[in-house]
Amino acid sequence: MGNCLQRTTRWQLDMQETPWNLRLSAKGRTCRYFRGWSCCHSVEGCSCLPWKNIRTFKARQESPKQNEGMTSAPVQDNANETYTEELCYILVDHEAVRGRPSVNPAEGFYENISNKAERHKESSRGTETEYSVLRFPSPPQPLPSTDDEYELLMPSRFSSHAFQQPRPLTTPYETHFSYPQ
């Protein structure tokens, strides 16, 4: 069994106020925490664990080694600004997902992991957990409004005399078009 790491900064927008109780049953830990975009509704063997990890840190770092434990570096616009990073963890049973063809397009959001990465590494503390990033597509951007936009279509070839003809003066709200003959 492996873990997949999902990082998001908008997860609070997609959630209702839910107490973070780790003693919930496996059925209670499913994707009711993540509405509308989670893989758990479509990938068998995946459950969302209600873990909340908030890291707050200053933009000014005294040593680069202090930042090694962080998953991302802060943007250093102002030395007095404070940044918050929130992580949400999703537990995936790779045994349930592995070995069957992918019929669901939602499963394409997993990063490919090499066979070497699928093995658990033995260490002095026991089996190490490996993380993979789940990638979700961004929502489609709305098209800009075309109410007051106009496009001027010009012929591909112009004759040289079309540019040499004198043009009458026009008011700002009046436009004249001349076509080559």
Curated annotation (Swiss-Prot):
Residues 117-128 have a biased composition (Basic and acidic residues). One of its GO terms (molecular function) is actin binding. Highly expressed in normal germinal center (GC) B-cells. Expressed in spleen and, to a lesser extent, bone marrow. InterPro entries: GC_assoc_lym. Its main location: cytoplasm. It is found in: Cytoplasm; Cell membrane. Phosphorylation on tyrosine residues can be induced by IL6. Phosphorylation is mediated by LYN. Keywords: Cell membrane, Cytoplasm, Membrane, Phosphoprotein, Ubl conjugation. GO terms for cellular component: cytoplasm; plasma membrane. It comes from the Eukaryota. The modification Phosphoserine is found at residue 102. The modification Phosphotyrosine is found at residue 150. Residues 117-181 are annotated as: Disordered. Pfam families: HGAL. GO terms for biological process: negative regulation of lymphocyte migration; regulation of B cell receptor signaling pathway. GCSAM transgenic mice develop B-cell lymphoid hyperplasia, hypergammaglobulinemia and systemic reactive amyloid A (AA) amyloidosis strating from 12 months of age. Interacts with ACTB and MYH2; the interaction with MYH2 is increased by IL6-induced phosphorylation. Interacts (via C-terminus) with ARHGEF11 (via DH domain). Interacts with ARHGEF12. Interacts with SYK; the interaction increases after B-cell receptor stimulation, resulting in enhanced SYK autophosphorylation and activity. Involved in the negative regulation of lymphocyte motility. It mediates the migration-inhibitory effects of IL6. Serves as a positive regulator of the RhoA signaling pathway. Enhancement of RhoA activation results in inhibition of lymphocyte and lymphoma cell motility by activation of its downstream effector ROCK. Is a regulator of B-cell receptor signaling, that acts through SYK kinase activation. This is Germinal center-associated signaling and motility protein. It comes from Mus musculus (Mouse). The lineage of its organism: Eukaryota, Metazoa, Chordata, Craniata, Vertebrata. The gene is Gcsam.
